[in-house]
Amino acid sequence: MARLEQLYSYDFSAFTDCALSPDGVFSAVKSFREIWKDPELFTFILCAKTEPAGLAIVRRLAHEAYDMEQFFVLGKFRRTGAGTAAAQALFQKFPGAWTVRQIPQNKAAQSFWRRVIDAYTNGAFEETKTPQITQSFTC
């Protein structure tokens, strides 16, 4: 997971002020530091066939309410259906109310999540901008 976190942080650095430490390592995002301690966080390594393809962290907010805390698909697996399949599998694994958030700078993530959630819910979702882009739906 730590290696995937570094790839995630590298990818995310295009949109944020994430900086490398003097030894060339990105500092851990808060949810990554907490994944082994917080019982409300569920961590997944996404796979395409047998190869690691990314990661997901789901946070339980309340009984049957969830937030997609982190979601990352390696570049070589983007636009292959791997991310869509992983997102749908997570929605099925955790039925209930969901929120999925993206930072305003990450237009590709916004497009991905709108497309995936629209298809999964048949358009039955709400989107707000405060300042993050947030899709909310129940499945």
Outline where the language-model segments fall.
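Conserved beta-strand-loop-alpha-helix junction that forms the acyl-donor binding cleft
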Residues: 99-114, 118, 126-130, 137-138
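Conserved acetyl-CoA-binding loop-helix of GNAT-fold acetyltransferases
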Residues: 73, 79-93
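Conserved GNAT-fold acetyl-CoA-binding loop/helix
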Residues: 6-32
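Conserved beta-strand in the GNAT
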Residues: 43-45, 51-60, 67, 72
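A short helix-loop-beta-strand connector motif used in the catalytic cores of GNAT acetyltransferases and
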Residues: 30-45
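Hydrophobic pocket/interface hotspot
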Residues: 1
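A short, internal acetyl-CoA/4′-phosphopantetheine-binding micro-motif in the GNAT/acyltransferase core
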Residues: 47, 71-79, 103-104
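Short glycine-rich, basic-tinged beta-strand/loop micro-motifs
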Residues: 91-101
